[in-house]
Regions:
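Conserved, structured core segments of small domains
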Residues: 1-242
Length: 242
């Protein structure tokens, strides 16, 4: 999974230039045709987001806008819901299984949100649930009891037509953080700390290894102006990942 951080233009709710949209579309299309792109989404600014913080059995819910604080995903769930409140309800149940921690809900950008096509009647609301990393996930995963409870909840969400798909990530010790400054690249091998920048979007890719991922990120950075931060993480494909 390649994850890029939020930028000031997205945070301000400004539409990207059409030239950038076309260039990015060509870039993604090329790799999709080659069978490399499995999934991906961009997220709207923080005003459309909700942060849930769980402490000592209590949950604090904060709607955006807000700044990034503990931005290090351990997993994601793509939800299709009728309202933001419905997504918050599912996120509360998910978070209570895990105990102390933090979850973020972010609205997924649709084609009509970025001016590519007109919005349909009663458009779907897709929200990305971001399960933030903690000591347990960085050490190798949740407990067997937590995994079983999450699996049951995901089954319920799927039956309700809410859960579109989900994935979990391996610890940052197996990832890399790429920082581009004017197209100059600095690579930080994991483990690495949480970022203070909100997640702006992600792509799930099937690649030969980090060398190919870094090459793709170079082109991606050039399209976006040459200055940005990208985390490259390995998707956990073990059978007991939950």
């Amino acid at each position: 999974m390649m994850m890029h951080k939020n930028d000031p233009q997205t945070e301000a709710g400004k539409l990207p230039p059409l030239e950038l949209v076309h260039k990015m579309g060509e870039f993604i299309g090329e790799h999709a045709k080659a069978g490399r792109v499995l999934d991906g989404a961009g997220l709207a600014g923080s005003k459309t987001r909700t942060r849930l913080t769980f402490r000592n059995g209590e949950v604090t819910i904060k709607n955006g806008p807000y700044r990034g604080e503990h931005e290090l995903p351990a997993g994601t769930l793509l939800l299709k819901v009728k309202t933001r409140e419905e997504a918050i309800g599912w996120a509360e149940r998910y978070g209570k299984i895990l105990g102390d921690g933090e979850i973020e809900l972010g609205k997924v950008n649709e084609p009509w949100d970025i001016g590519v096509m007109p919005a349909p009647e009663n458009p779907p609301l897709q929200m990305l649930l971001i399960d933030k990393a903690d000591k347990a996930t960085e050490a190798g995963g949740r407990t067997a009891q937590q995994k079983a409870a999450i699996s049951r909840l995901k089954t319920e969400m799927t039956k309700a037509g809410v859960l579109v798909r989900s994935l979990n990530l391996q610890p940052t010790s197996k990832g890399k953080r790429l920082t581009f400054t004017n197209n100059n690249l600095q690579v930080l091998d994991g483990p690495f700390a949480e970022s203070k920048e909100l997640l702006g979007g992600f792509a799930v890719l099937e690649l030969s290894g980090f060398e190919e991922a870094i090459a793709m990120c170079r082109t991606y950075a050039e399209i976006l102006g040459g200055t940005l931060e990208v985390d490259v993480r390995i998707v956990d494909q073990t059978e007991d990942a939950a």
